[in-house]
Regions:
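Beta-strand-rich binding/interaction modules
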Residues: 116-118, 205-252, 637-678, 684-689, ...
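Extended acidic/polar, glycine-enriched regions
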Residues: 142-146, 213-310, 704
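Extended carbohydrate-recognition surfaces in non-catalytic/accessory domains of CAZymes
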Residues: 12-106, 161-178, 525, 582-585, ...
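Active-site-adjacent substrate/metal-binding segments within catalytic domains
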Residues: 51-94, 98-106, 111-119, 124-127, ...
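Substrate-binding clefts and catalytic carboxylate motifs of secreted carbohydrate-active enzymes
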Residues: 16-34, 48, 83, 110, ...
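Terminal connector regions
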Residues: 278-279, 286-298, 656, 694-738
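Substrate-binding/catalytic cleft of secreted carbohydrate-active enzymes
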Residues: 349-352, 364-596
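Accessory beta-strand-rich segments of carbohydrate-active enzymes
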Residues: 27-29, 78, 82-192, 215, ...
Length: 739
């Protein structure tokens, strides 16, 4: 069986692109030889779980658990399946008109270990999993005829030791397959191999770095040519209008059978800034001329934005810029039983990455432990979400030179996306070669972004340290401690007390570079409301072993609300990204959705993020007394003195009224009072308050509504108060539901 499909081709005067996305024949073998017969179909892009009929080991990859067990990590070597070779096959017609052209097959992303055959000739192989692979197929093609393309994709078990492909101790299965676009391009004997448009908004220019690939044969005999003259024309247009705002032609020589580097700068006419609120895009076009003949034309989108740091803060286009958002762990989501083809559904991804985040005032996302298909970045470019882009490096894997090769390819490949503002080389680890040798080298290639090196700080990196990523998981101890009541008496965690510093917070306060808290919480749930593998003890401690999904979700929402308020109240923190916006269900952690993930139905935690992440907000600085067990109850009829904490992430003053409401266990408002507040730009304001507590013992809810001038709806903060000894359970409080 062979897959004969029409292909979609488009030309750009010098380059013709033939898309090979679509349905391919597919099958698996235990040995490294192709199957005699192909019995399945598979979409490209798409991992092996999308094959139909299903692959034989499908149930091993996606078995749903009967219950929750406390598990801290998984050793990848303890596999419960048989590694297989995966074979993608199809035929494509190559027109006779291309016989004088140079043809390349490009696979944007494929994992793990990819070999390509055209008409039974091997044309190349690659161990890279997260960056594009280009294969010269010119010599193997039959023109005016159908051509068989066969792609073998290996298993993670066979990834060579030198490959820059880390492991993730919170993953169990690493699904192989082709997971980004596949296409053929036809050009002349010189072609754009790679290009970077690197903006400087402050200077009003863009620096363009180009690698030109020459396909002329190398010098074989003495006196044969080694180089050929060429011209490269650069043209910058506004993406939406097509108006040309900059143009330049340079001349040079391209070394035969090699890649040649060119660099130039282009001044732009009245450049418009790219920001999350106004994501203005340009198109950068590169045309290569060989003996005055156009032989290739290639274009990319980019944006004019300057992302940098000043002291402990990030800056965007010269202004202080606080990052607010969450994390995406797509490689983990791939092992979700409900993942299916959602990762390649543009509308679903737009809702996940753009619509939902912007609805709650998020402006940023961390692509965590592994990058994403290229169109995800395109969406963030187009709609204005800034990204911290992290390689899959958690547990160490890879030899230095191969890591250098893959990371360099990564910067060239993803470096035109204005949404990517931070390269994240490592997650929660240390690597001296990456931090002190490779990052400075890559900073020379792309000086327009900041590098994060995991847990490496200025102590290990000196002046190479541009930012840190602290992870203040204050509830982590709950995973192991068997005597939690005694633990909290000796190590009190007053959840909601915004003024109290955590013992691990000193390094954040003392650091001299921006601190991006891109993980915190440790309060994950599965989408059915059950605790995750890492948080079973958390919920058992606070709620008991038979808590309902609704009770678990309410605790999670409240906990994350208060921890977010705590972090945002420390204004020296440069950004806060909650963990996690998308991950696999039934795993070690969890995300902010409930029920079927295809519907992206937000959990209560996500709905409360609208308030604690509001750019301008007012929080209650009081410790929780509903769930925490080590605090004494408040005295009935006493005066409660506390602060309201106003925070402002914006470069303009925020002002308005704060309405305080005290509700009893039935939701009845028993008292109100009003305060006025003004918060300076990028500032913090402490507003002292005095509240007369009721004389009746019970469980109460204190709500602060911040009615900001110019904002339609109030921003809420809440605290549960235990007054007297009448309350015996967390159930004896009013459940406040957001509309």
């Amino acid at each position: 069986m062979c897959c004969f499909l029409s292909v979609f081709a488009w030309a750009d005067d010098g380059r013709t692109t033939i898309s090979l996305n679509g349905e391919w024949d597919f099958d698996q073998t235990e040995l490294a030889f192709p199957p005699r017969k192909y019995t399945r179909k598979i979409p490209v892009p798409g991992l092996v779980h999308l094959a139909r009929p299903k692959i034989s080991q499908y149930e091993k990859f996606f078995k749903k658990p009967d219950g929750v067990e406390l598990v801290e990590q998984f050793n990848f070597l303890e596999r419960d399946y048989t590694p297989m070779y995966n074979w993608y096959k199809r035929k494509v017609f190559i027109d006779e008109k291309f016989k004088d052209e140079q043809l390349f097959l490009t696979i944007k992303k494929s994992q793990y270990v990819t070999r390509v055959f055209v008409n039974r000739h091997e044309v190349g192989a690659s161990m890279e999993c997260y960056t594009p692979m280009d294969f010269n197929i010119t010599s193997a093609v039959k023109y005016g005829s159908d051509n068989e393309i066969l792609i073998q994709v290996g298993d993670r078990a066979w990834l060579p030791s030198e490959a820059a492909g880390g492991t993730d101790k919170e993953k169990v299965h690493y699904l192989p397959g082709i997971w980004d676009d596949v296409f053929i391009t036809a050009t002349g004997k010189m072609r754009v191999d790679k290009v970077l448009f690197l903006p400087s908004l402050a200077k009003g220019l863009v620096t363009v770095k180009t690698l030109v690939r020459s396909l002329y044969p190398p010098q074989m005999l003495y006196g044969d040519k080694m180089k050929d003259s060429c011209k490269i024309e650069y043209c910058v247009k506004e993406k939406t209008t097509g108006r040309i705002v900059g143009k330049k032609m340079i001349e040079g020589e391209a070394k035969r059978d090699n890649r040649t580097y060119f660099e130039t700068s282009i001044s732009l006419d009245n450049p418009k800034a790219w920001t999350p609120d106004s994501p203005f895009l340009y198109e950068g076009e590169v045309s290569v001329y060989d003996q005055d003949e156009l032989v290739d034309r290639y274009s990319v989108n980019f944006g004019m934005r300057d992302f940098s740091r000043k002291g402990k803060f990030f800056t965007l286009n010269g202004d202080k810029f606080y990052l607010r958002g969450s994390n995406i762990t797509l490689q983990r989501f791939f092992e979700d039983p409900d993942c299916q083809a959602l990762a390649w559904d543009r509308e679903w991804v737009k809702k996940l990455m753009v619509d939902l985040p912007k609805s709650i005032d998020w402006n940023a996302m961390r692509i965590c432990v592994g990058i994403v298909p290229d169109f995800w970045y395109d969406l963030c470019d187009e709609y204005g979400i800034v990204l911290q882009n992290e390689w899959l490096y958690w547990q160490n894997h890879g030899w230095d030179e191969q890591v250098r090769k893959e990371y360099t390819n990564w910067v060239w490949s993803d470096g035109n996306h204005p949404s990517i503002v931070i390269w994240d080389a490592i997650n929660e680890n240390w690597d001296s070669y990456i931090g002190n040798t490779l990052i400075p080298e890559l900073k020379e290639l792309d000086p327009t972004r900041i590098w994060d090196a995991g847990y490496m700080t200025s102590d290990q990196m000196g002046t190479n340290d541009e930012m840190d990523e602290p992870h203040p998981y204050r509830a982590l101890t709950l995973m192991h401690s068997s005597e939690l009541n005694d633990y909290f008496k000796n190590n009190p965690y007053n959840l909601g007390a915004l003024h109290e510093n955590w013992v691990g917070f000193s390094s954040i306060l003392d650091a001299g570079v921006p601190q991006l808290v891109n993980e915190y919480g440790w309060i994950w749930l599965w989408r059915d409301g059950r605790p995750s593998k890492l948080t079973l003890n958390n919920y058992n401690y606070y709620l008991g072993e038979n808590a309902t999904p609704e009770q678990c979700r309410e605790l999670q929402a409240y906990w994350l609300e208060l921890e977010t308020e705590w972090l945002r109240s420390e204004r020296s923190v440069g950004g806060i990204l909650a963990f996690c916006h998308l991950t696999n269900n039934y795993g070690f952690t969890g995300d902010w959705f409930i029920n079927d993930i295809k519907d992206l139905e937000p959990s209560p935690a996500f709905r409360w993020f609208k308030h604690c992440f509001a750019p301008s907000a007012v929080f209650i600085d009081l410790a929780d007394r509903r769930y925490t067990k080590h605090l004494e109850p408040l005295k009935p009829g006493s005066d409660l003195v506390f602060n309201l904490v106003g925070v402002n992430d914006l470069n303009k003053e925020s002002s308005g009224k704060v309405l305080l409401k005290l509700l009893d266990e039935k939701g009845t408002i028993i008292s109100t009072q009003e305060e006025s507040i003004v918060i300076e730009p990028f500032g913090k304001r402490l507003q002292p308050c005095l509240l007369k507590l009721p004389s009746k013992s019970g469980g109460y809810l204190l709500i602060a509504e911040y009615h900001e001038k110019g904002r339609a709806k109030p921003v809420l903060s809440r605290r549960y108060l235990k007054v007297g000894d009448a309350v015996t359970s967390f159930k004896d409080y009013f459940e406040y539901t957001l509309n």
